Amino acid sequence: TPEAVMQLAYEGAVYGESIGADIPSASVSKRILLAKEIVNRNRTRGISDTLDELVGLLGAGMQAVESIPFSLGVFYAVSGDVQKGLLAAVNGGDDADTNGSICGNICGAFSGVNALPKRWTSRIERENRIDFLPIAKQLLNR
């Protein structure tokens, strides 16, 4: 569930903070919890209001302390829907390509390859001359 993903992301951030270098910065783990609170507070108000508050309170910049909680918040707001997540993350502004990439990857991992429109994957494979399915299978078998 998206709830479980948020919990695991929080736990991973707590672990990372426990072993990482102690630098003066906001806590990614606490900001993940804040992202979740923001989304829950805005469930009835729509994605636009949710994005406004995520950006306003967390930021949407390239620094991990902003991009990770923001992208996870968008993932949670759209319940892992790849198309909605990509659109929302990019429309959040600031470092749109970073956040779109992070959120898109989280949503894609959660929802699976079949959640991507075939016209998207076909074009990417055609334009890049890459068949990603064997590469993905090889990565999974490592």
How does the language model describe each region?
Residues 1-70, 76, 125, 129-142:
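Phosphate-rich cofactor/ligand-interacting catalytic cores and adjacent structured alpha/beta frameworks
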Residues 64-142:
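Catalytic phosphate/nucleotide-handling subdomain of diverse soluble enzymes
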